[in-house]
């Protein structure tokens, strides 16, 4: 896994590096979800929507671990996961924070075959060869992570 993207020192720098010069946040929407992190939809000046999770600056390891897990799941080719755009920390105006940027996936209507397709994909994930990101067995991730983070 290439973790170079995890070294962003500000959200503004991350957005410029990922999307190009002149890109800024036009609007931020707070999203509901988990209890541990804050979730946002960032609407950028180019019209693109990005999903951002945020937490205290000292909890940046949450997002490093989550990105590693998403890369591992994606490497199996069995089930769709959001694309990791970047992660890092920002000193903020008043308080520092850590962040994880992902592709924004809009909710939609489930097709008639949604649950069957999901079940087959989930089963394929559990059958996948995970030795490249496990401790050499069929279980256990190669690095510690955070359940529920």
Language-model regions, residue ranges each:
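Short loop-beta-helix segment that forms the pyridoxal 5′-phosphate
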Residues: 26
